[in-house]
């Protein structure tokens, strides 16, 4: 039983995001400079100007976009879906609205490019 526990813990440790070696999908056609004002207008009210999720009026608290152990392992396609279709589309909070009707495909890619420029910790 002890060996099984050790093996299971080892498997969890090796497959955790901090140790994953997979390449994470990144878009190459987003423009962070164009995404900055879009982020400020549509995202910062909840996620904060610095991406740290400063809107403490929400429960659960808004996702911190600058946590290195989180954001570095999130594919751009996932972020695209969350922004375009809302949190519910990926099993997350319904408080995250769908911006696909407001933002173009390029706008969303630009916002993602801007998010990728935020300092992580």
Q: What do these predicted ranges mean?
A:
Residues 5-15:
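Bacterial N-terminal signal peptides
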Residues 30, 34, 38, 78, ...:
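Extracytoplasmic/secreted proteins, especially bacterial periplasmic and envelope-associated proteins
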Residues 16-38, 54:
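Electrostatic cytochrome c docking/interface patches
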Residues 35-49, 96, 111-115:
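The canonical Cys-X-X-Cys-His
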Residues 52, 117-121:
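Inter-heme linker and motif-flanking segments adjacent to c-type heme-binding CXXCH motifs
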Residues 36, 52-80, 102:
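Gly/Gly-Pro-rich "capping" loops immediately C-terminal to redox-active cysteine motifs
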Residues 59-64, 85-118:
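Axial heme c-ligation environment in periplasmic c-type cytochrome domains
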């Amino acid at each position: 039983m002890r060996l099984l526990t050790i093996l299971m813990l080892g498997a969890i440790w090796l497959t955790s995001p901090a140790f994953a070696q997979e390449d994470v999908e990144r878009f190459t056609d987003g423009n962070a400079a164009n995404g900055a004002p879009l982020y400020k207008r549509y995202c910062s009210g909840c996620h904060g100007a610095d991406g740290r999720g400063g809107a403490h009026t929400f429960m659960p608290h808004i996702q911190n976009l600058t946590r290195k152990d989180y954001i570095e392992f999130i594919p751009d396609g996932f972020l695209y879906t969350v922004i375009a279709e809302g949190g519910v589309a990926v099993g997350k909070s319904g408080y995250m609205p769908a911006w696909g009707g407001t933002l173009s495909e390029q706008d969303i890619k630009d916002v993602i490019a801007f998010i990728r420029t935020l300092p992580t910790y």
